[in-house]
Each structure stands twice: as structure tokens, then as C-alpha cells.
């Protein structure tokens, strides 16, 4: 039996799936629908979503379209990059990190308009359903969550198109449809489905939309500098930029030089493996630069302990636990390590590669002048003998014991 719902806030893109969901919610739940469309740098016009929502009977005051690019990069992407977060050694979490912001705004809008439910368009097989719904319930444990893909029988594109036709839902014709399922934001674009479902099949070159191929990248390297303040990038080549503008600029550098493509098989939280191809040009550059900045500003043990946190931190984001107390606890520890991570990194970009060729910081712990001091003033080489013997003590003891046997 369908639960009684008075008003629902739908995460709405204006595409086929969410437009069908909009009409389905109206029919199935007989409720008022509020649409929320977030601009997080997906590169598509978001205003058409307003026109389509109006055509589908949504009141103007129930249509929310917001530019969240700066908030997305400042409050989600940059904190994640302070951790150098990578899932399973390769994935820079571009899709994962966008979901908590969208969910947060849905809950805030629901509170604002007096809605008792939220809805999303994620399928019942993927990670996004988990990410959205854990975020919803973390922020409002009393909210009703509607996941149409787990309820309806419109389980094919043909059925969706038939429903759209029967309900006069406008469908744009864009010629040949891409065989891939794609998702984009300011950090990355992802590709799934089509021939990628065969892990042996190489994707066609024309699949990649954001970056040049290695073959078409410039034959000459390009040098850039990135300035950091307390772990976050603040300027490129000495020019201060807002978080979103800075990531946009790095994306352009990465696009030009063929940086940031990966083709991986990942372990989904729901239990199955999936293949995905990703382009994260700016993020790939930023990760390399940030690690270089840390290399001269973090104490050895501080850096090593921070590195131990990273796999779990990345897993929490991938699985949808951004608002969990454990992620917030880890974030506080990570942010503490960034207090001295300020300075400049110089990079060479060339045919898919990011080379660190220089780094400097007013807080640098790299002090070559110590090696030029007179003997015994800072470091007496004879002290190494005791240091080595103490660290070898357990091996010496073990060797004696084994020999007696």
C-alpha cells in the first residue's frame, strides 16, 4: 500500500527519467510535487528544466533551480582533496561527492515548503540510491523517501518512452542517443553501460568528451603554478580564483593535455562489480599538487597517520556516509594537519602526465642547510650507531633465539 504523501521534493534534471518520475508521483501518490534542479557544473543548461516542469503542471513557486558550483567545490570537493581521497587506488569520487550536497538542499527545501517526502531518480542497482537516502535520513530521520525505480514497473527505456507519450511529456530529440549512461559535474564526467559492460572491450575514442587523447595533446609541455593556503588551492599562476573558477581553469589545462582519464572496475557498496570510465582533469592535477605541497610541510609521522585515514575516508564518501559522525571526526583530524600546508607548487603538464617540478613554502620542513653545519652542532653522524642498534634490537634478539634452537 502506498504511503500517504502530501508534498514531495524531487531531485529533477528535466530529462526523460525524472520527467516521467514527476508525472508518476502526481498519479501514484496524488501529491503536490516540488522540483529541485542543482547546477553543480554538469555543463548543461538547467533553465529548460523550469520550462518542462511548468508544462507538467508544477506551480512556479514550487520550482527551485540553484547554482551550487561554488558551494560544491568549496565545501565538498576541497575538503575531500585535503584528504587526498582515492577509492580503490584510482577513483577520485566525482559522482560520490556530489550527492550529499543535492540531498542536503532537498531536505532544506522540504523544510522550507513544508514537504513530508523527498524523491530521487537513482536506480535500484546502483550506489546513488544509498548515497541519497542515507543523506536524507541523516539530515531528517522523519522524512519519507520515495525511490520510484524500486516501486514501478517502468523498467526499460521503451516503457519510459511509452509512458511519456501517453502522458504528453515533452521529449527532446537529439539524434542518435549515446550508448553510455553519463553523469557530470564540475569535478568529473562518468561513463557506464554500452560496450563498457564487457570489461575486455576498449571504449571508442569519441566516448571521451572532456579531454584530448594523448595522441592529440600538444607536443610541448606547459608549466603552471598552484598556490595553496591551509590545504586548499587559491590561485593559478599567481592569479587568485574562487573555488569553482579555479577548478574550471584546472579542467581546461587537463583537457588540453589529455590528463585525467581512467578505465576501472570498481566494487559497488551494494555488492556487485561495475566498470566505469571517468575523466577528472582538474582533480588529477590538484591531487598531485596537493600531495607535493604536503611533502614539504607535514611532519613524517603526521603524514603517515593521515595516509592511514585516507582509504577509510574515501570508502565513507563512496558509500554515502558524508554526514556520518565518523567522517566528520576524520575531517577534523585531516583539517588539523592542513594548518601549515601553504605555499606554491610548480607543475609540468605533458601528454596525460602531471610532473611536479618545484615546491616551496614558508612552512617548509625541508632544511638542507642542516647538513652544512659543523660536526655535532645539529647532527652528529656517530649518533646513528646507537639509533640503528636500538631499532635492530628485536632482530638481534630473534637471531640469537633462533640460533639456539
Swiss-Prot record:
Chemical reaction(s) catalysed: L-citrulline + L-aspartate + ATP = 2-(N(omega)-L-arginino)succinate + AMP + diphosphate + H(+)
Residue positions binding L-aspartate: 123, 127-128
Top-level EC class as recorded in UniProt: ligase
GO annotation terms (biological process): argininosuccinate metabolic process; L-arginine biosynthetic process; urea cycle
CDD domains in alphabetical order: ASS (cd01999)
Gene Ontology MF term list: argininosuccinate synthase activity; ATP binding
SUPFAM superfamilies, per the entry: Adenine nucleotide alpha hydrolases-like, Argininosuccinate synthetase, C-terminal domain
Chain positions recorded as ATP binding sites: 11-19, 38, 121
InterPro entries, A to Z: Arginosuc_syn_C (IPR048268), Arginosuc_syn_N (IPR048267), Arginosuc_synth (IPR001518), Arginosuc_synth_CS (IPR018223), Arginosuc_synth_type_1_subfam (IPR023434), AS_cat/multimer_dom_body (IPR024074), Rossmann-like_a/b/a_fold (IPR014729)
GO cellular component term, pick one: cytoplasm
Compartmental location: Cytoplasm
Binding sites annotated in the UniProt record for L-citrulline: 91, 96, 127, 131, 181, 190, 266, 278
Pathway info: Amino-acid biosynthesis; L-arginine biosynthesis; L-arginine from L-ornithine and carbamoyl phosphate: step 2/3
Keyword line: Amino-acid biosynthesis, Arginine biosynthesis, ATP-binding, Cytoplasm, Ligase, Nucleotide-binding
Signal sequence annotation: none
Record-listed E.C. numbers: 6.3.4.5
Protein family (similarity comment): Belongs to the argininosuccinate synthase family. Type 1 subfamily.
Oligomeric and partner information: Homotetramer.
Protein name according to UniProt: Argininosuccinate synthase
Higher taxonomy: Bacteria, Pseudomonadati, Campylobacterota, Epsilonproteobacteria, Nautiliales
